[in-house]
Amino acid sequence: MPKSKELVSSSSSGSDSDSEVEKKLKRKKQAVPEKPVKKQKPGETSRALASSKQSSSSRDDNMFQIGKMRYVSVRDFKGKILIDIREYWMDSEGEMKPGRKGISLNMEQWSQLKEQISDIDDAVRKL
């Protein structure tokens, strides 16, 4: 157990050492306490794994690769169907995560894009 401020300062002989002791005490007080680790119950872990497996398998069914780590995916978000054209990246556990680069189209935007595909193809050929 550390000595109190009074005991340390009375036992030291110089004023320089007093200021050093005060600095050390302040540093100890400023040290950030470690965050407690939340423990998961065994039942919660298995439920979380089961739901993540279900969502990843349904996600894989609706993903279409169009390039290296680039996919078009169809998903439901808050009751609306979205078509994502997005880059993905691998996390440290080897799981694919969606990246920032990409776009989500609602059904109206997707329909407009499909209608204009032939015009877009023509523009590409001209270049």
Curated annotation (Swiss-Prot):
Any Pfam family: PC4
Protein name: Activated RNA polymerase II transcriptional coactivator p15
Span list, region Disordered: 1-63
Source lineage: Eukaryota, Metazoa, Chordata, Craniata, Vertebrata
Region (Interaction with ssDNA): 77-101
Gene that this sequence comes from: Sub1
Site positions per UniProt: Cleavage: A50, S51
Modifications made to the protein after synthesis: Activity is controlled by protein kinases that target the regulatory region. Phosphorylation inactivates both ds DNA-binding and cofactor function, but does not affect binding to ssDNA.
Gene3D superfamilies named among the record's database cross-references: Transcriptional Coactivator Pc4, Chain A
Modified residues (N6-acetyllysine): K35, K53, K68
InterPro entries named among the record's database cross-references: PC4_C, ssDNA-bd_transcriptional_reg, Sub1/Tcp4-like
Low complexity compositional bias, start-end: 7-16, 46-57
GO terms (BP aspect): negative regulation of DNA metabolic process; positive regulation of transcription initiation by RNA polymerase II; protein homooligomerization; RNA polymerase II promoter clearance
